[in-house]
UniProtKB/Swiss-Prot annotation:
Protein name: Seipin
UniProt keyword annotation of Membrane present: yes
GO cellular component, one term: lipid droplet
GO molecular function, one term: phospholipid binding
Organism: Homo sapiens
Tissue localization of expression: Expressed in motor neurons in the spinal cord and cortical neurons in the frontal lobe (at protein level). Highly expressed in brain, testis and adipose tissue.
Domain of life: Eukaryota
Outcome of mutating residue 90 to L: In SPG17 and HMND13; also found in patients with hereditary motor and sensory neuropathy type 2; does not affect the function in lipid storage
Role, per record: Plays a crucial role in the formation of lipid droplets (LDs) which are storage organelles at the center of lipid and energy homeostasis. In association with LDAF1, defines the sites of LD formation in the ER. Also required for growth and maturation of small nascent LDs into larger mature LDs. Mediates the formation and/or stabilization of endoplasmic reticulum-lipid droplets (ER-LD) contacts, facilitating protein and lipid delivery from the ER into growing LDs.
Major localization listed first in the record, in broad terms: endoplasmic reticulum
Protein location: Endoplasmic reticulum membrane; Lipid droplet
Length: 398
């Protein structure tokens, strides 16, 4: 007896272990579901902010090389060109996506890379013209600017050559000037007439240049200015706002689905149950009226159903007469083609509401099995069986 193991203590420890293991599994499952939900909401928030940023922010800067061409069918003995250098620049990406966005102001500049040659120094001022066109080649905007090389004296050129001689010898520096010509300071795209390209022309036949680039830079204001100059701060605020909004929606949906604490359904379900009960009563009344045809010359009666709240049909009177109360039990009327022997209900002086309802105390004695068959046959036919009239039992008023 002394060496017997403590069985109740072991059982208690086993039960406690099972309970703790169940709680641990439940907590682990809840934590996993919560973590997956938070991760999904965070991913959706980042996706929404990225989609908004991509659709709302235009191209910040667009740099396109400018390739000039000119005629060569003139006399080659002269040093000047046969025509002005002209270039056609497309303002679409891949032939489909446009570079410019509607309503956004842009700064359009032309960068010219000119050598400091004696020809360019003697060139003086020259004119640069840009013509923007839309579909079909129709010109919609034109702008012209004058340009010239920056002046430097012979002494300054000599000193510059001496200082940067080592870099010039190894090719790390060149004797050239980069001119930036502002063609449009505030160019706005028209949504009805989009810009598809531009034609650039230099009005000089003696110009010498290394290359040229057309730069289009967006000038942001308002929200776009904040998104461009403070990208990390705006991204954090945008993702946090989306995450908060989605979390509130998910929380309200969870509360409504689990507890139903926001919009309770008790009143709505009660109304639905009452409507269903009324519909079932009407259906039973319709079926009873279908079993009682009214021939010509006979007095039509209004059958009423003995349906209770549980939906029992009048075909089983033994189960309904004891359950119906005086307020819910309908008045019993005689069948069509039968004569009533009760003067109080047929002479018009009284009403069916004045007659007392049947109760368990004054129910008539049940008829034998042999006598119930003619009654059933009478309910299914318009003529009484055997030519006998069924008398309605007189109910004593309480």
């Amino acid at each position: 007896m002394v060496n017997d193991p403590p069985v109740p203590a072991l059982l208690w420890a086993q039960e406690v272990g099972q309970v703790l293991a169940g709680r641990a599994r439940r907590l682990l499952l809840q934590f996993g579901v919560l973590f997956c939900t938070i991760l999904l909401l965070l991913w959706v928030s980042v996706f929404l902010y990225g989609s908004f940023y991509y659709s709302y922010m235009p191209t910040v800067s667009h740099l396109s090389p400018v390739h000039f061409y000119y005629r060569t069918d003139c006399d080659s003995s002269t040093t000047s060109l046969c025509s002005f250098p002209v270039a056609n620049v497309s303002l679409t990406k891949g032939g489909r996506d446009r570079v410019l966005m509607y309503g956004q102001p842009y700064r359009v500049t032309l960068e010219l890379e000119l050598p400091e040659s004696p020809v360019n120094q003697d060139l003086g001022m020259f004119l640069v013209t840009i013509s923007c066109y839309t579909r079909g080649g129709r010109i919609i905007s034109t702008s012209s600017r004058s340009v010239m090389l920056h002046y430097r004296s012979d002494l300054l050129q000599m000193l510059d050559t001496l200082v940067f001689s080592s870099l010039l010898l190894f090719g790390f520096a060149e004797q050239k000037q980069l001119l930036e010509v502002e063609l449009y300071a505030d160019y706005r795209e028209n949504s009805y007439v989009p810009t598809t390209g531009a034609i650039i022309e230099i009005h000089s036949k003696r110009i010498q240049l290394y290359g040229a680039y057309l730069r289009i830079h967006a000038h942001f204001t308002g929200l776009r200015y904040l998104l461009y100059n403070f990208p990390m701060t705006c991204a954090f605020i945008g993702v946090a706002s989306n995450f908060t909004f989605l979390s509130v929606i998910v929380l309200f949906s969870y509360m409504q689905w689990v507890w139903g604490g926001i919009w309770p359904r008790h009143r709505f379900s009660l109304q639905v149950n009452i409507r269903k009960r009324d519909n079932s009563r009407k259906e039973v009344q319709r079926r009873i009226s279908a079993h009682q045809p009214g021939p010509e010359g006979q007095e039509e009666s209004t059958p009423q159903s003995d349906v209770t709240e549980d939906g029992e049909s009048p075909e089983d009177p033994s189960g309904t007469e004891g359950q119906l109360s005086e307020e819910e039990k309908p008045d019993q009327q005689p069948l069509s083609g039968e004569e009533e022997l009760e003067p109080e209900a047929s002479d018009g002086s009284g009403s069916w509401e004045d007659a007392a309802l049947l109760t368990e105390a004054n129910l008539p004695a049940p008829a034998p099995a042999s006598a119930s068959a003619p009654v059933l046959e009478t309910l299914g036919s318009s003529e009484p069986a055997g030519g006998a009239l069924r008398q309605r039992p007189t109910c004593s008023s309480s």
